[in-house]
Each structure stands twice: as structure tokens, then as C-alpha cells.
Amino acid sequence: MKFFAVLALCIVGAIASPLTADEASLVQSSWKAVSHNEVEILAAVFAAYPDIQNKFPQFAGKDLASIKDTGAFATHATRIVSFLSEVIALSGNESNASAVNSLVSKLGDDHKARGVSAAQFGEFRTALVAYLQANVSWGDNVAAAWNKALDNTFAIVVPRL
């Protein structure tokens, strides 16, 4: 859960350039379209970046095909996606900015303790965006909203790593 909480990064709207209500709506609706695919999201990230998989002790060094259909994998994927869903749901409302900042700050602190690098957060971002592009209605407006949300998230997380 810890690493994919990174996904949560994607949704902050609580920094210098918070998401507008329209941008938050685009992020939320596109996320809603895929958030039930927890296992597929995590598997896509691991397939694209095995170094991320190796940050998870219970999955490190194992063949993705052999772990993808296990209960442990599904449970972990659900934890990650649930965290991301919480952050995404809070985005776009100025009164939630402090809550989002707290969640994302803790994410950065927790990942620093695990030795996760800014580069690995970047890999996660790339894999997540690729998954979204392949599985939701994706246009320039959706891409811009996700990029802004992810930029905002990284502005909080990266300095804490």
C-alpha cells in the first residue's frame, strides 16, 4: 500500500496551484472508471517498472504472473487504490487542502523511510498515466488535469524524500 499510496500523489489539489472544480471532476471521473481494477493497476506498474515491485518485500524477486492472482497481491492493490481514492475524493475543494496535504506529506515521510527515490515516484507516475491513457477516455483536458494533480503532489512529496 505504501508505494501505491504514491498514486495518491496524483490527486492533491492543495498547493500553490490547486485543482479547479472542473479539473478535480476530470481526475475524479477518470479515476472512478478504473479504480475497481486494483489488481490490474498495480500489475501494470510492476510490469513497467520491476524496481518498484522490488520495493515491496512480499513481492520482491518474484515473477509477476505468479503473484498477480494471489490474495496478498489483491489485498495490497486494494489498499493502495483505496488510499488514492481517498485523496482523489478530497481534491478540488479548498476546505480539504489541509487534509490532502497531511495525507500526501505522510506518504512522502513513509516512503523516505523505505528508501524510495524521487525517480521511482516518477516511474510510478509514468506507469499510472500510461494505464489511465489506455483505459479511460483521455484527451488534452484530462491529461492536463492529471498532470496538474501529479505536479501538485510531487511538490509535497519530493522534498520529503
Swiss-Prot record:
Cleavable signal peptide: 1-16
Keywords: Heme, Iron, Metal-binding, Oxygen transport, Signal, Transport
Statement: the UniProt record of this protein carries the keyword Metal-binding: yes
InterPro entries for the chain: Erythrocruorin (IPR002336), Globin (IPR000971), Globin-like_sf (IPR009050), Globin/Proto (IPR012292), Mb-like_M (IPR044399)
MF terms (GO), sorted A to Z: heme binding; metal ion binding; oxygen binding; oxygen carrier activity
Cross-referenced Pfam families: Globin
GO CC annotations on file: extracellular region; hemoglobin complex
Domain of life: Eukaryota
Positions of the Globin domain: 18-161
Residues engaged in binding heme b: 76, 111
Quaternary structure note: Homodimer.
Additional record remark: There are at least 12 different components in Midge globin.
Family per similarity comment: Belongs to the globin family.
Name the record gives this protein: Globin CTT-VIIB-8
Species whose genome carries this gene: Chironomus thummi piger (Midge)
